[in-house]
């Protein structure tokens, strides 16, 4: 009944969580335009103001051109065409001297405008890049700080993978949106405003008529922009979910590989990518439709302006000449063009605001327990008296399930108190409340008569040392891991703590001693070694309150007895709280507290509670512990009598070959990234060639618009050489209609670009993410052991590198094609109408090209550096968030924050140089056009005077080349994105071309019809590829007959778990063979081999899905029926628990199984293994996390499961393996003795002493 009540409460909670998650979607999901700059300091505000002013001045340069152009047109047309109405320009009434004077003045105007554009263009871009980098750095820092400051309850209900994606992808989008794009936005606004003012002053009637279409342009841009923001938010959300899956899978890769679940996880990842792809396609279409609508209305405006302008001239309106019409027209054109040019920048800014919404939400979240708080009382010393007063508690993520129900408990200073009870009774909850990871719902927790909520949280936690059941080590050296215990730990203190934790000896055996890297999550250390390093870390804190949560569970008997003694010694003078299933370790405790269903069932010393014959008595009896006689107890195994490891020369021949190879591969890996050309990147889009072709055709069509425009424009100017009003009116109507047609072409071609390139680009992004993730999943484990392939680094590649490849594909190719068509046609038309002038202008073009090349080269370098530093920063962030409980317990938040900041600082140092280069290149390419105009008009005037060119030809050449130059400028703006794309593609190709040594995808190798289960290790030597100087196995030889149960025992680091990994073929031996039924494992098909093996690991990994899906994970080759799932659950003694949950087998287990206790997770892992019905069963400490009742039942289930199977058991608990067919004692990677339990006891050697050390008969 109680189970079903709990179940109903859990169901309500899941429903509540689901609703809560959907709530924000109803609100606006973008921050305000000013709010996005909230992290700007005084200097940033100054830089932004100066940047804005420079943008406004730079923006004013363009509208000044029409004034000069109008003046010149009037001179040319009225002087040459209207008065003489002849094509013999030698006979112009206007004197050559006057024309020379005008052209010289015109040239000086253009040079002046060009100088202003050069100076202010440089200032605006460089200042905005600098301030954006400064603010982005602050946002990254503040976001990470805010996440670390959150209480643990918040982490229970949020997705770590999603947080990592936000930290990389979303903040990158903010950086893009608040940088140089803002400068360009203000420049366009300035051009628009001043252009408008010029137009109104020169001819207000024509300006107002021209402006009548502006509301339509703005309305269409605004509507599309709103749509883009909404779709971007949805797209980012889908990518965040995909990122969460990737993070979960990559951090649990050993489990994924063991159960051959690569394809299943790939599908789960790809499903989220499909959602993102669909939103991405819609976003691209909306963006291009917006652009198409703007250009449609603009061209319509041109037609209207010329038609109405011609009418005003023909009707004799005062002040209106062709020069006036041109000045007004170009002023409005530039204003309108700036609206179009501003749309992409506004869109980038809108995307940044959308991304900032989620980032700022986390930054503004006020935690209920602030890990960085300076408030609260800081007593000079803490005695360690602890009292729980009527404490009730439920986890915030499960508010309806009461874990503690009015707990009252007093612990005196210096006492050792043991908490015992079944799984789920509240033992670990008590420990977490004492650390103030959570606050109780009711009641008080007092330390030295102070409510712990009144104490400063950091100061208080500094007095607590914790050693947990699943110790967390960080991906750095042993030395750093121990020194994380507290600030300013000396080497002497570190070594003393290592000795006390019985870790010193094995550490000194490593070549690098305390500087040995432990690997990601301590992967290079055995369970026992990790546990002892964690104990050393706790002891170095010198805590007043010591919490031991199954602190010796991962240790072998020899280490356990030594560490137990060290812990007992460490407990002296400290308040010690012990959570243990092994009741033999707590008999000497001052007080034993038995918990049941969140309440205190009984308490007292061991003898008292045994006399009561209550719950504690029944727990002790179920463990069947009997005191060995005193003679046996005195025979402890001396660590000094350890057999020395093999002499070095016996393994020299192996080392010399393999270490060299390992070092060579490491060196080559550091330097080799494949060369990536544009063609190689484009080939990635090959399957979408129909979309690319159609998109390209649309781009070519769009590229023809401006060259055609230049011809029509020149025709309109020169048609005033004809005095026939009827002809003029007819021509004006025809040319105006052509402008409208050009507008329709623009709209259709932009829509087609969005439709086809959007699809091609998003499908490519999805495919590349899919391929990259697939390539990662099928690498061998040795690759994941490498430092640079941490989970954080790999998720950064998936999030950032691949998104950047779009900078050289999809719609970017559309822009390049459009610009290439524009430039090509412009040059051809220019040559036809005035080849001399065209030559002059084109001779200047290479300068622009060189500028672009410099910018591209510089940007590629900066992109690579930035990527590398952000990858390192991402690794630190991922590690911190995944192990947040440990970091909070150790109060190491500031240390991780500092490391993260150091990585950001390194990346930030590139910014100033980057700003100078990009600013200079932009300013030069932007201002160069004015200088080209100056030279061109001066030369054009000379050609007209010499009779080698007509004014019409000059206008066509100028307009065509101007649009061609704008196309070059637009292309140069894309250079940085192309650089990033090349850099991202290089990393992607390096990943895709990496061939694993053990290829799980390979179809090669034998697939025997049956697997008997005979195993053999034949002269196996092995070292981990990332530690080639430390041999783990040294010539191991052992035969295991089918159906037999063989147990591996020995001290931590002796090679037990390594043997298990070699059987799974996660690694290959360095020398020797691992044989299955007499066949070398290397000759067998990898997937077939792993399908014959199931493993129950020491630290079970569950996935963020339902219980049924987690059990079905045992066999990923088919859809497993529910009956089979229930059968496996029944065998693992967890079926009745699951049935009591509201959603039964559909209950979600949470991230890393967070909604379940350790024992429940372990039993699910056992069910998962049993479902596979394997021929070979590997049990690596399979019952370590279970309480006594569960252990008995599960042990019985495992004994039953072993029948007819070959079973390899790795354990420290010798009571569990007494019935094994063969017990193998490993020491320093070699077999020291083997036999049955009775035979080894008679030998009275290592095993005999291990048994006695455990005091188990």
Curated annotation (Swiss-Prot):
EC assignment: the record states: 7.6.2.2
Q: Name one GO biological process term.
A: regulation of membrane potential
Gene Ontology CC entries for this record = apical plasma membrane; plasma membrane
Q: Where is this region: Disordered?
A: 1-24
Name the top EC class. translocase
Q: What are the protein's UniProt keywords?
A: ATP-binding, Cell membrane, Differentiation, Glycoprotein, Membrane, Nucleotide-binding, Repeat, Translocase, Transmembrane, Transmembrane helix, Transport
Matching SUPFAM superfamilies = ABC transporter transmembrane region, P-loop containing nucleoside triphosphate hydrolases
Tissues where the protein occurs: Expressed by CD133-expressing progenitor cells among epidermal melanocytes (at protein level). Widely expressed with specific expression in pigment cells. Highly expressed in several malignant tissues: highly expressed in clinical melanomas, with low expression in normal skin. In melanoma, marks malignant melanoma-initiating cells (MMIC), in which clinical virulence resides as a consequence of unlimited self-renewal capacity, resulting in inexorable tumor progression and metastasis. Also highly expressed in a number of leukemia cells. Expressed in basal limbal epithelium.
Domain of life of the organism encoding this protein: Eukaryota
**Which GO molecular function annotations are given, in alphabetical order?**
ABC-type xenobiotic transporter activity; ATP binding; ATP hydrolysis activity; ATPase-coupled transmembrane transporter activity; efflux transmembrane transporter activity
In the bilayer, the protein is annotated as: Multi-pass membrane protein
Answer yes or no on keyword Cell cycle: no
Q: According to its UniProt record, which reaction does this protein catalyse? A: daunorubicin(in) + ATP + H2O = daunorubicin(out) + ADP + phosphate + H(+)
Residue ranges occupied by any ABC transporter domain in the UniProt entry: 386-622, 1015-1253
Q: Where in the cell is it found?
A: Cell membrane
Q: One short Pfam family name for this protein?
A: ABC_membrane
Q: Does the keyword Membrane apply?
A: yes
Binding of ATP occurs at: 421-428, 1050-1057
Q: What is the effect of changing residue 880 to T?
A: In a pancreatic ductal adenocarcinoma sample; somatic mutation
What PROSITE patterns does the record tag this protein with? ABC_TM1F, ABC_TRANSPORTER_1, ABC_TRANSPORTER_2
Q: Which residues cross the membrane?
A: 49-69, 110-130, 181-201, 203-223, 294-314, 322-342, 693-713, 737-757, 827-847, 917-937, 954-974
Which family is annotated?
A: Belongs to the ABC transporter superfamily. ABCB family. Multidrug resistance exporter (TC 3.A.1.201) subfamily.
Fill in the misc note. Acts as a marker of stem-like cells (CSC) in a number of malignancies. Associated with clinical drug resistance, tumor progression and disease recurrence in malignant melanoma and acute leukemias. Responsible for the resistance to doxorubicin of a subset of malignant melanomas.
* Function description: Energy-dependent efflux transporter responsible for decreased drug accumulation in multidrug-resistant cells. Specifically present in limbal stem cells, where it plays a key role in corneal development and repair.
Q: What is this protein called?
A: ATP-binding cassette sub-family B member 5
Task: Please tell me the species this chain comes from.
Answer: Homo sapiens (Human)
The gene is ABCB5
């Amino acid at each position: 009944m109680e189970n079903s009540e709990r179940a109903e409460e859990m169901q309500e909670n899941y429903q509540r969580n689901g609703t809560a998650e959907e709530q924000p979607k109803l609100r606006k999901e973008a921050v305000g335009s000013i709010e996005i700059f909230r992290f700007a300091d005084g200097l940033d505000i100054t830089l932004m103001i100066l940047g804005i002013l420079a943008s406004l001045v730079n923006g004013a340069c363009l509208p000044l051109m029409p004034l000069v152009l109008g003046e010149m047109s009037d001179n040319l047309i009225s002087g040459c065409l209207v008065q003489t109405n002849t094509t013999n320009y030698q006979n112009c009434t206007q004197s050559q001297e006057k024309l020379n004077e005008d052209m010289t003045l015109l040239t000086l105007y253009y040079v002046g405008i060009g100088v202003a554009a050069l100076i202010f263009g440089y200032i605006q871009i460089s200042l905005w890049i600098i301030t954006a980098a400064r603010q982005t750095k602050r946002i990254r820092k503040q976001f990470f700080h805010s996440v670390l400051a959150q209480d643990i309850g918040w982490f229970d209900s949020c997705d770590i993978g999603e947080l990592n994606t936000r930290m990389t992808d979303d903040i990158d989008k903010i950086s893009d949106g608040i940088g140089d794009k803002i400068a360009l936005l203000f420049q366009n606004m300035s051009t628009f405003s001043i252009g408008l003012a010029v137009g109104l002053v020169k001819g207000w009637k024509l300006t107002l008529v021209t402006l009548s279409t502006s509301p339509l342009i703005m309305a269409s841009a605004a509507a599309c922009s709103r749509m883009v923001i909404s779709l971007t938010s949805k797209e980012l959300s889908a990518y965040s979910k995909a990122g969460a899956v990737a993070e979960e899978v990559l951090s649990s890769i050993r489990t994924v590989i063991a159960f051959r679940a690569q394809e299943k996880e790939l599908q789960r990842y790809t499903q989220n990518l499909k959602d993102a792809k669909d939103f991405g396609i819609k976003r691209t279409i909306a963006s291009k439709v917006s652009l198409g609508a703007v250009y449609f209305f603009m061209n319509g405006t041109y037609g209207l302006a010329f038609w109405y302008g011609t009418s005003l001239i023909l009707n004799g309106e005062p002040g209106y000449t062709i020069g006036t019409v041109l000045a007004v027209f170009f002023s409005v054109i530039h204003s309108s063009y700036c609206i179009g040019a501003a749309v992409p920048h506004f869109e980038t800014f809108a995307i940044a605001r959308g991304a900032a919404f989620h980032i700022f939400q986390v930054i503004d979240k006020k935690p209920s327990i602030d890990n960085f708080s300076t408030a609260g009382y800081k007593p000079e010393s803490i005695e360690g008296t602890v009292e729980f007063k009527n404490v009730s508690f439920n986890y915030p993520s499960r508010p309806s399930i009461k874990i503690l129900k009015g707990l009252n408990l007093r612990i005196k200073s210096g006492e050792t108190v043991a908490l015992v009870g079944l799984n789920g009774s509240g033992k670990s909850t008590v420990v977490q409340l004492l650390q103030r990871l959570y606050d109780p719902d009711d009641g008080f927790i007092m330390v030295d008569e102070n409510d712990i909520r009144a104490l400063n949280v950091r100061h208080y936690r500094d007095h607590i040392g914790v050693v947990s059941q699943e110790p967390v080590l960080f991906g750095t050296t042993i030395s750093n891991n121990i020194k994380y215990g507290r600030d300013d730990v000396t080497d002497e203190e570190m070594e003393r703590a290592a000795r006390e934790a019985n870790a010193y000896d094995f550490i000194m055996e490593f070549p690098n001693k305390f500087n040995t890297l432990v690997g990601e999550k301590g992967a290079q250390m055995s369970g026992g070694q990790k546990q002892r390093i964690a104990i050393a870390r706790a002891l170095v804190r010198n805590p007043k309150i010591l919490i031991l949560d199954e602190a010796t569970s991962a240790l072998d008997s020899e280490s356990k007895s030594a560490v137990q003694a060290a812990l007992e010694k460490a407990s002296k003078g400290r308040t010690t709280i012990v959570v243990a299933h092994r009741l033999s370790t707590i008999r000497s405790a001052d007080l034993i507290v038995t918990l049941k269903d969140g309440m205190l069932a009984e308490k007292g010393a061991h003898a008292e509670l045994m006399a009561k014959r209550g719950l504690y008595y029944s727990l002790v009896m179920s463990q069947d512990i009997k005191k060995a006689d005193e003679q046996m107890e005195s025979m402890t195994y001396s660590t000094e009598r350890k057999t020395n490891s093999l002499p070095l020369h016996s393994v020299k021949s192996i080392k010399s070959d393999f270490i060299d190879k390992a070092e060579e591969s490491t060196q080559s890996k550091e330097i080799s990234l494949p060369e990536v050309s544009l063609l190689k990147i484009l080939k990635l889009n090959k399957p979408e060639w129909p979309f690319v072709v159609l998109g390209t055709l649309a781009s070519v069509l769009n590229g023809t618009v401006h060259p055609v425009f230049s011809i029509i424009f020149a025709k309109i100017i020169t048609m005033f050489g004809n005095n026939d009003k009827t002809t003029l009116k007819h021509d004006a109507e025809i040319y105006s209609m052509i402008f409208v047609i050009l507008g329709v072409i623009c709209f259709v071609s932009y829509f087609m670009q969005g439709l086809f390139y959007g699809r091609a680009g998003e499908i490519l992004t999805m495919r590349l993410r899919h391929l990259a993730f697939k390539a990662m999943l099928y690498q061998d484990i040795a690759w994941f052991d490498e430092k640079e392939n941490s989970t954080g680094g790999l998720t950064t590649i998936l999030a950032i590198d691949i998104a950047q490849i779009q900078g050289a594909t999809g719609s970017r190719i559309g822009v390049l094609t459009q610009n290439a068509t524009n430039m090509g046609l412009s040059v051809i038309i220019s040559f036809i109408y005035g080849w001399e002038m065209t030559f002059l202008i084109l001779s200047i073009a290479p300068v622009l090209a060189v500028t672009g090349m410099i910018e591209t080269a510089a940007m590629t370098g900066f992109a690579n550096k930035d990527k590398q530093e952000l990858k390192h920063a991402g690794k630190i962030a991922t590690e911190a968030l995944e192990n947040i409980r440990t970091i909070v317990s150790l109060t190491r938040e500031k240390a991780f924050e500092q490391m993260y900041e150091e990585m950001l600082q390194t990346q930030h140092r590139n910014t100033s140089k980057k700003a100078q280069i990009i600013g200079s290149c932009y300013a030069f390419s932007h201002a160069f056009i004015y200088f080209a105009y100056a030279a061109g008009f001066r030369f054009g005037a000379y050609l007209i005077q010499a009779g080698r060119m007509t004014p019409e030809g000059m206008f066509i050449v100028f307009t065509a080349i101007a649009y061609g130059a704008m196309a070059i400028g637009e292309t140069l703006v894309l250079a940085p994105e192309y650089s990033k794309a090349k850099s991202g593609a290089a990393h992607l190709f390096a990943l895709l071309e990496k061939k694993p040594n053990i290829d799980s995808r390979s179809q090669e190798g034998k697939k025997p019809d049956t697997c008997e289960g005979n195993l053999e290790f034949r002269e196996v030597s092995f070292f981990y590829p990332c530690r080639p100087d430390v041999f783990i196995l040294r010539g191991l030889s052992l035969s295991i007959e089918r159906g037999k149960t063989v147990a591996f025992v020995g001290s931590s680091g002796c090679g037990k778990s390594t043997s298990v990994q070699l059987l799974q073929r996660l690694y290959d031996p360095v020398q020797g063979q691992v044989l299955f039924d007499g066949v070398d494992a290397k000759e067998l098909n990898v997937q077939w081999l792993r399908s014959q093996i199931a493993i129950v690991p020491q630290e079970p990994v569950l996935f963020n899905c339902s219980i049924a899906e987690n059990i079905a994970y045992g066999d990923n080759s088919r859809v497993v029926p529910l009956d089979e799932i229930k059968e496996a659950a029944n065998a693992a003694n967890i079926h009745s628990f699951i049935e009591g949950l509201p959603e039964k087998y559909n209950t979600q287990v949470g991230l890393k199984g967070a909604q379940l206790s350790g024992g429940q997770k372990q039993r699910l892992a056992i069910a998962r293994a049993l479902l596979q019905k394997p021929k070979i069963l590997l049990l690596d400490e399979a019952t370590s996390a279970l309480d006594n009742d569960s252990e008995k039942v599960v042990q019985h289930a495992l004994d039953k499961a072993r029948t007819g199977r070959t079973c390899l058991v790795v354990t420290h608990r010798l009571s569990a393996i007494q019935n094994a067919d063969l017990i193998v004692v490993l020491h320093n990677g070699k077999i020291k003795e083997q036999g049955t339990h009775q035979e080894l006891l008679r030998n009275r050697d290592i095993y005999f002493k291990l048994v006695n050390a455990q005091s188990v008969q």
